[in-house]
């Protein structure tokens, strides 16, 4: 698989001198003809095995440089899932975190098995019945999940504890909604909101 991806990348590099000379890029469309489950792609990452993962409004796709493989984001034990994929992240344990319109699922990349992320805060709050905008990790290995209709969650992997943060408690609830999140190289977590500016945690 990696050899196919390498050949694909080399074929692109072959044309780079032309790109530099003309200032133009040639884009090759990867669509339903290649097996893509939906043309509305909301998230893209490359995993540690070299595969490209695409989250769409109708399914999770894995691309090996030639063809697509569609995955059913479904927890067989709990018997529920969701196919509207909005965020993707791979952690240090080669687990793929999949944000959907109904919370977060975790896929073991080695087995392909999905499990629903059902951790709860001390007050019993759970990331569910809400769409996920971002998933990322900070320098300490904590997983941060941005669920705009609920707030920002921090999951301590070592302890299994989940914490919820509301960036800017306000009478206007719509302004509390986090819209984007990132971690800078100093380890500070930045949260952009819908109408109340930007906040940071450190």
Regions of interest found by a model, annotated:
Residues 1-202:
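Carboxylate-rich, polar loop motifs that coordinate divalent cations or form catalytic acidic clusters
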């Amino acid at each position: 698989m990696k050899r196919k991806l390498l050949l694909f990348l080399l074929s692109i590099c072959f044309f780079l001198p032309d790109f530099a000379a003309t200032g133009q890029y040639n884009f090759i469309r990867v669509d339903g003809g290649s097996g893509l489950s939906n043309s509305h792609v909301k998230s893209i990452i490359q995993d540690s095995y070299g595969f490209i993962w695409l989250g769409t409004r109708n399914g999770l796709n894995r691309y090996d440089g030639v063809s697509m493989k569609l995955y059913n984001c479904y927890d067989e034990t709990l018997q529920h899932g969701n196919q509207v994929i909005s965020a993707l992240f791979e952690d240090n344990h080669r687990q793929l975190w999949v944000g959907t319109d109904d919370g977060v699922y975790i896929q073991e990349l080695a087995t392909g098995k999905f499990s629903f992320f059902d951790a709860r805060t001390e007050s019993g709050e759970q990331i569910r019945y809400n769409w996920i905008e971002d998933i990322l990790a900070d320098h300490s290995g904590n997983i941060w999940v941005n669920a705009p209709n609920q707030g920002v969650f921090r999951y301590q992997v070592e302890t299994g504890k989940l914490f919820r943060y509301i960036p800017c408690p306000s009478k206007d609830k719509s302004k509390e909604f986090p819209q984007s999140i990132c971690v800078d190289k100093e380890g500070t977590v930045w949260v952009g909101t819908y109408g109340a500016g930007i906040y940071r945690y450190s």
